[in-house]
A protein has these predicted regions:
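Active-site region of glycoside hydrolase catalytic domains
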Residues: 1-196
Length: 196
């Protein structure tokens, strides 16, 4: 749970949240040296999606895809900052992240269903995996993200050039990626009003 004081400042959309989360992680590393396996964030995509798309987690927003992707981007960034700090601290353990990944399939072989599956895969998997494992966002992933955001009448998120080095360094230092897998999704093309 996000402390209310940080939620009031924007939660995962705020740079103050990122700085506080990094400081908390550094404190934990020093305070608990006997811990040898660290997870920076568990299921960040679930958190952001439920905060800004389904509205089931505070701040309980619905269909705010740009904010969802910005929160995801910020979570990837602070994850990278934490990995880099852990490795710079010379701690003897291992550090990683846990993603909830969902295999996405088109409902049919139609071009529309295939594209719908690509969009959902970018939303559920690619955006996180690009930042975590590749240390950069591919043009294809960003094009799909932009399409989702613009289809919902919102503006593209801010991706800063200076963050790329932080992400790239962490991707090379990451010890493991945990995967929580619950189910697959089959996607069908749809061009109507969002029903969430």
């Amino acid at each position: 749970d996000t402390p209310q004081a940080l939620e009031d400042k924007g939660g995962w959309l705020s740079s103050e949240m990122l700085d506080a989360f990094l400081a908390y992680a550094k404190y934990c590393f020093k305070e608990f040296p006997e811990v040898k396996y660290w997870i920076t964030i568990n299921e960040p995509t679930s958190m952001a999606g439920q905060q800004y798309v389904s509205g089931t987690f505070p701040p309980a927003r619905v269909n705010e895809f740009a904010k969802c992707f910005q929160a995801e981007y910020n979570q990837n960034l602070v994850h990278a900052r934490i990995v880099n700090a852990y490795k710079a601290g010379g701690y003897p353990g291992k550090i990683g992240i846990v993603h909830a990944l969902q295999t996405v399939y088109p409902a049919s072989s139609s071009a529309g269903d295939q594209h719908a599956a690509e969009l959902k895969d970018a939303f559920e998997n690619r955006f996180y995996l690009d930042g975590t494992l590749a240390g950069k966002y591919s043009k294809k992933t960003l094009d799909l993200v932009r399409e989702i955001i613009e289809a919902n009448g919102q503006e593209m998120i801010e991706i800063k050039a200076e963050d790329e080095e932080i992400l790239a360094q962490a991707a090379q230092k990451l010890d493991f990626v945990g995967v929580n897998y619950y189910f697959s999704k089959f996607m069908k093309e749809y061009h109507g009003e969002n029903i969430i």
